[in-house]
Amino acid sequence: MVVTASRTPEKKIDANADVAVVTSKEIEEKHFDDVAQAVKNVPGVFINSHGASGQVGNSDQIYINGSPNVVVLVDGMRRNTNGNSLMNASIAELVAMDSIDHIEVLKGSASTLYGSDAQGGVINIITKKAKEDGVKTTLRTSFGDNSKEKYTLYNAGKEGNVFWSVEAGKELAGDYKDGWGRKVINHLNAEHYNVKLGYDLGNDSDITLNYEKYKADYTRPDYGSTSIVSDKGKKDNDSISLQYKARLSEKLTNQFSVYRNKTTFKDNYGKSAKDLWAMDMKTTGISDQLTYTANKQTLTGGFDWYKDEVPYNMGSEPEGDSVHNIAFYLQDKIDLTDQWNITPGVRVDHHSAFGTHTSPSLSIGFKQNENTNYYFNYKTFFVAPNMYQLYAPGIPFYGPVGNKDLKPQEGNTIEFGINHNFSDTLSGTFNIFHTHAKNLIQHVNGYGFENTGKANVNGFSLNLNKDFNQHWNASIGYSFIHMPATAPNKNINSDGILPESTLNINVGYQADKFNANLSGRGIMNRYGTKADWSGKPTKMSNYANYWVWDLAANYQFTKEATLFARVNNIFDQFYTDIGSSQDPYGTWYSAPGRNFEIGLQFQF
């Protein structure tokens, strides 16, 4: 397995980092609807979803190693948004799953190469590129309960030096029932288009133009799953990018990218102006990277520039506001001996609102042999408040939301890890970390933002992967995170939003024409919000522990045709992914109960 945690390809076992990979094979066999579904079972990753899908209402909030400050990339290009309240990137709206080659989840601060705001980690989505002449087409359709329908077309190929891919899809969904059998208002009518066109320049060089489009109409409950009042919304996102990769010499490569991402949504439209939430967000960016590889040294350097804008926000702040950031970075991996390596790095950011900041880093690796690698990392981070946290208008009866006096969140992460192959069929990883942050930016009384002081996060994760024989395989991952409560009226782990322990289990079976995967996710000690805005204790602690099991199966009955099925939440577990929910009969966002999906796939 080759990964790019250091922005250069290397074997996964050699990476001085805690990296998990979701492969295209796993995406195809488990039929994930979006990137959020694909990464939520990665140990150390927690996804806050307000219902059946982040496509309905707010997109899913991502946490890695306890931090919501995560950088999301597609082919190395930034996809974070700036201006919304509940998300850092719209990963539930990244639904072009056939176009994905693999997803790398880098856990732990990665500030030097990926951005000083990558406090928790990085999700890098690597898309497919046709490498051999020929054309491949995939057609897929599926139906399920809760009025779910899904249709997808994917075509990719290469002819001479020209390569391309085209993906189009439509998804429909209706009301669902939670684990208690209660109906939850839900409607989705979404479509997406993705076009990639490239030219192979030879000598490991190419130029690629990519365009993505996502549109959706949705209906959600007004406030919590028990609400009988429905609110309507619309989303309209698009992204365009141009990327040039070149091998300038045997030792020197270059990657240049320019991109523009746009997100538009209207939530609660059709109601009074005071209830409408309409917003446009736009990001424009340019990046360039040079990598020089010698016998015992890999030098990586470059610059990133991006500008975040909120062109429209219902005529209130942050409408018309923008921020920009330019950064220069340099990292040098030096092989001191055949076993020891050291990687110093530095990133210098200049933020238009918060000035210049330097983020140094240091990594030390010891490769005991071909099967064992130890590493120690020290990384710093610098997270500027987003425009919503700075400028959002106040809410009647609740007080101010935005706070123009916020300071950037700063700190460092120290981690130690081991990557080890016990045998050809058994591998494992272990990682332990400590993060210290100051000027922590948090909600106060559920609405306004303040710097609440310091925070110390301790955690570790353990993963094992085993191939028993040609048919059976299994994996197990455990992660532990502890963040002390920041006030007497708060719970641990960001007031109970995050679980202390998570256990992820996967069992796979593979035969000539049949395969199946059983996945389980155990959440332990996620106590939820301790008190509501009035100080009254919530009932979240009664639902602090639960298990959710999913099953996916595929049967290839001809060379071109495959029948597939999914059962989600097999045991009809009642739960919520939103730790800030308070009462199952009040402010509560239920996840779907047991639900089914069956479909056909044709490839030719």
Predicted regions and their residues:
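N-terminal periplasmic accessory domains that precede
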Residues: 35-38, 60-63, 73, 90-93, ...
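Extracytoplasmic beta-strand/coil segments of soluble accessory domains associated
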Residues: 36, 40-78
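Short acidic/polar hinge/loop motifs at secondary-structure boundaries
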Residues: 61, 78-107, 403
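Periplasmic-side early beta-strands and strand-to-turn transitions of outer-membrane beta-barrels
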Residues: 112, 124, 132-134, 140-142, ...
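Conserved C-terminal beta-signal and adjacent last beta-strands/turns
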Residues: 155-159, 198-202, 376, 495-604
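Surface-exposed extracellular loop regions of Gram-negative outer-membrane beta-barrel proteins
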Residues: 215-217, 264, 309, 316-317, ...
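Outer-membrane beta-barrel signature, preferentially recognizing the C-terminal barrel domain
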Residues: 225-247, 279, 367, 373, ...
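Gram-negative outer-membrane beta-barrel transporters
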Residues: 335-342, 432-436, 451-533, 559-562, ...
